[in-house]
A protein has these predicted regions:
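Adenine-nucleotide phosphate-binding core of ATP-dependent small-molecule kinases
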Residues: 98-119, 300-308, 337-366
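Early-domain small/polar-rich strand-loop-helix modules and first-structured segments
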Residues: 1-96, 220, 225-264
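Glycine-rich phosphate-binding loops at beta-strand->alpha-helix junctions
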Residues: 134-147, 307-308, 375-396
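Conserved phosphate-binding/catalytic loops in two-lobed NTP-binding clefts
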Residues: 160-168, 375, 394-420
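Gly/Thr-rich phosphate-binding beta-strand-loop-beta motif of the actin/hexokinase/Hsp70
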Residues: 2-29, 179-214, 382
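Phosphate/ATP-binding catalytic cores across multiple sugar-kinase/actin-like superfamilies
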Residues: 112-125, 171-182, 318-321, 351-377, ...
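Phosphate-binding glycine-rich/basic clefts of nucleotide- and phosphate-handling proteins
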Residues: 41, 205-334, 430
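Conserved phosphate-binding catalytic cores of ATP/NTP-utilizing and phosphoryl-transfer enzymes
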Residues: 1-7, 165-191, 416-427
């Protein structure tokens, strides 16, 4: 990069990770690298850690990204670790999280996250470009997502970042990035596999030098991605040890334990928030009436001992191992709970089979909207961490030839493309 002031900033605010790119021309962008003892380079984890401190805002201090992880690991019982909070952006059910008795709305957490992110950029973001391009999913995560509510919350989250803020579908950012490598006119299908959603865009790419290089034809998405695959692992390997499928006594009846507690426990965005007096009191009451109280006791212990992040890490290790091997060891130890078992890729693929069918249906919806058949697609670009899962790759290889499919920049391509869109003469053409 030269010393020229950047024209635009592209922000890929992801469910799992956040990446930022700056552009100073229509065909060049570079990533912001975060430096420091706990830094993970260009990838900033979309997570927050809170702890009580008199000098903090309203008596609560906070950290974000890899520094949030470091704070949590240093003092897990005295902190609250929140991750995947983007997943509740479009949820009308979520109003606020109670953290150490203080309410935090989505936009409160979002503004804190952005403030810490800028702090850790080491001056690279001290002066923001006038044009900010923020990625958003085509379809938000969660049951009955409300995109208008998500837009309102995003506006509040980003209101201090400038007046010219554009929201662009995340797969379009990846398409713009990949198009810079193409040397001939191409009909391109982009699939973005994030933490909370899977999104598709079909784009017509003109030859280099054209006045409008990329023309979006259609987009679609579904609220299923990496976190859902994690949930399947937790559902099959962890929750049966915590009381799922068990029963409790209510007067003269024996009833199945309600599934809501298990749904919350298997959702990374909600697990940390279960550590509150009301939920723990309800679980202790349930434990007293359970036919077998021991499993519910394990759940209570995991929540009280803040074992959400260690469990997340254990699930992630097993899932990553299954991308390269037919079997993986799932090993977790914490809160008095020990799990050591072997999981096969065949079992994992069986658990996520219905999720894959819904993902494939979303891809078909994008093609239908674009009025194209699979044979009309010249290239397919897969991005996002879950694109590395063999079953995901196989889904595309059934529909397209292997030499049509490209991968790369799984965690960074969207931010690159968003920054390039921001340097375009009229980014509003891409905005939604």
């Amino acid at each position: 990069m030269t010393g020229i002031a950047p024209i635009a900033l592209g922000l890929d605010f992801g469910t799992t990770n956040t990446v930022i790119a700056l552009s100073d021309s229509a065909d060049e962008s570079h990533l912001i690298s975060f430096k420091g003892e706990d830094s993970t380079g260009e990838i900033f984890r979309s997570a927050l850690c809170f702890w009580e401190e008199q000098s903090g805002w309203n008596g609560i201090a906070s950290e974000a990204g890899p520094w949030a992880i470091a704070e949590f690991l240093g003092s897990p019982l005295d902190s609250r670790f929140v991750q995947s909070f983007k997943s509740v952006a479009a949820s009308s059910i979520f109003e606020r999280a109670q953290i150490f008795g203080r309410p935090f709305r989505f936009e409160d957490m979002g503004r804190l996250f952005l403030h810490k992110l800028r702090d850790h950029a080491g001056g690279q973001l001290s002066k923001l470009p006038s044009r900010i391009v923020v990625g958003r999913p085509v379809e938000y995560a969660g049951p009955r997502p409300d995109p208008a509510l998500a837009r309102q919350r995003y506006d509040l989250m980003f209101e201090q970042w400038g007046s010219e803020i554009h929201y662009v579908y995340e797969p379009l950012g990846a398409a713009f990035s990949f198009a810079s490598w193409l040397e001939r006119p191409t009909t391109l299908l982009v699939a973005d596999f994030g933490g909370g959603t899977t999104d598709f865009s079909v784009v017509r790419v003109a030859e280099p030098g054209s006045s409008q290089r990329c023309q979006p034809l259609a987009s679609s998405g579904v609220g299923i991605a990496g976190d859902r695959f994690d949930k399947r692992i937790v559902d099959h390997l962890v929750l049966p040890l915590l009381g799922k499928g068990g029963t409790y006594r209510s007067f003269d009846k024996v009833l199945e334990i309600p599934g809501g507690y298990f749904g919350d426990f298997a959702d990374w965005s909600r697990l940390a928030l279960m550590r509150n007096k009301r939920t723990l009191d309800e679980l202790r009451k349930l434990q007293r009436s359970a036919v077998d109280p021991t499993p519910i006791g394990r759940m209570i212990a995991l929540i009280e001992h803040e074992q959400g992040f260690p469990l997340y890490e254990a699930v992630g290790r097993a899932k990553r191992a299954l991308t390269a091997s037919d079997e993986a060891e799932f090993s977790f130890s914490g809160g008095g709970v020990e799990i050591n078992t072997v999981v096969s890729r065949r079992d994992f693929e069986r658990w996520i089979a219905e999720d894959l069918r819904r993902i494939e249906a979303a891809m078909d919806a994008a093609l239908v909207k674009a009025k194209l058949e699979p044979a009309d697609i010249d290239r397919v670009f897969l991005t996002g961490g879950s694109s590395l899962i063999p079953a995901i790759r196989a889904l595309f290889e059934r529909r397209f030839s292997v030499d049509q499919i490209a991968t790369g920049g799984e965690l960074t391509s969207i931010a690159h493309g968003l920054a390039l869109i921001g340097s375009d003469a009229n980014p509003a053409e891409w905005s939604v």
